[in-house]
């Protein structure tokens, strides 16, 4: 009986473990979390590469610091949207395409639309250990996630109200 339970547990866990090792599945999980009615922030960090996860964490700390320095009637320096999307509005449709993989790198196209406006973002993944991790997002409207984070942190927050 114990052997049967162990075999069943392996059959259940194995597909979950392999899901994180496919670039398309990683991107699908990322956008499912971003698009959720209440975005699931706990799901996202394990999908990110070490450098990107550190940059996102630093951006959040920086936002909190800016908020603490701002006057009560002043809006602090912050991103008013998901950092993973270029536009502040969430897309109405998201379709994850097939990855173009070469060695330890993979680009996955993500087609999105709001009304009649359509664009394709490209997600860069890199193998880290056994898993594929998101390293950057290049937005179809121009720019990329790493660039936005660098630009955001270049602004110097100062105490207001003298």
Over which residues does each language-model region extend?
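N-terminal signal peptide c-region/cleavage motif recognized by signal peptidases
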Residues: 13-18
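Bacterial N-terminal signal peptides that target proteins for export
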Residues: 1-6
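Short, aromatic-enriched amphipathic alpha-helices that serve as compact interaction elements
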Residues: 21-39
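Low-complexity, intrinsically disordered terminal/linker segments enriched in charged
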Residues: 101-105, 109, 115-120, 136-162
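Hydrophobic/aromatic beta-strand elements that line small-molecule binding cavities or substrate pockets
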Residues: 121-127
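Short, solvent-exposed secondary-structure junction/capping segments
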Residues: 35-67
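Surface-exposed, charged secondary-structure patches
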Residues: 56-117
């Amino acid at each position: 009986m114990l052997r049967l339970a162990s075999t069943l547990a392996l059959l259940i866990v194995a597909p979950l473990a392999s899901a994180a090792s496919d670039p398309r599945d990683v991107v699908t999980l990322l956008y499912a979390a971003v698009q959720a009615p209440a975005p699931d922030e706990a799901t996202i960090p394990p999908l990110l590469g070490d450098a990107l996860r550190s940059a996102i964490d630093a951006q959040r700390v920086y936002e909190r610091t800016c908020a603490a320095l701002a006057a009560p009637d002043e809006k602090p320096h912050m991103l008013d949207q998901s950092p993973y999307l270029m536009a502040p509005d969430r897309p109405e449709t998201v379709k994850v395409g097939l990855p173009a993989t070469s060695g330890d790198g993979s680009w996955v196209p993500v087609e999105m639309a709001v009304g009649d406006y359509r664009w394709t973002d490209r997600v860069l993944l890199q193998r880290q250990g056994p898993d594929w991790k998101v390293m950057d997002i290049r937005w179809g409207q121009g720019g990329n996630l790493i660039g936005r984070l660098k630009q955001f942190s270049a602004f110097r927050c100062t105490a207001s109200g003298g």
